Amino acid sequence: MAEAKHAGALGAVYEAKRPEEVAALYDGWAGTYDAEMAVAGYRHPSIALALVSRHVPRGAAPLLDAGAGTGLIGEWLGIMGYPHVEALDISQGMLDQARKKGAYKAYHCLALGGSLPFADGHFAGIVSAGVFTSGHVGVEGLPELIRICRPGGVIVLTVKNTVWEGGFADEIARLERDGVVRRAEETEPYVSMPGEVGTIPSRAVVLVRN
């Protein structure tokens, strides 16, 4: 199923081909991102937060918001009882918006898909919403998130169906067979932006690091 062509900044980031292009587009979008995504009815943050609260013990620390953007998730995690959350995003402009909310203890301007400068097992939990999607990150971003999550830690991801069916589901199945992770929960497919006509459904998945 081909995704409908989206207009404006959303369409541009979905069609981006290189990480530096994605970063520049988000830098330019950062100031109006929250308002525009509210109009689109953006659901990933609320779904991811519900799964974090269900699977990550209150007080667990540190947590990583991978693809934190403007802090739509991070600003709620502190309220929910998670005292130390760090932000990672490819766009400094988006992180600057998140910093204004005081949502995180640290801000890392980095891209998923390559090596990350964190020790093995550093984080008690990781959440990544709206990142494994068109023009952003594919299954290549998963190994490092698993590496930096401690044994027993929880990884909450949202994944667009095209990415899921393009190798992500097979990789998770392989990791389960190899005993690397356990799939604790997988949602039914849902439309992440009901205000955007033609949005391909996504799903959320919760992995526990063995």
PLM regions and their residue ranges:
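Conserved alpha-helix/loop element of class I SAM-dependent methyltransferases that forms part
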Residues: 42-59
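Class I SAM-dependent methyltransferase SAM/SAH-binding core
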Residues: 64-66, 70-115
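A short glycine-rich, Lys/Arg-flanked "PGG" loop and its adjoining helix->strand segment in the class I
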Residues: 140-151
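Conserved Class I S-adenosyl-L-methionine
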Residues: 168-188
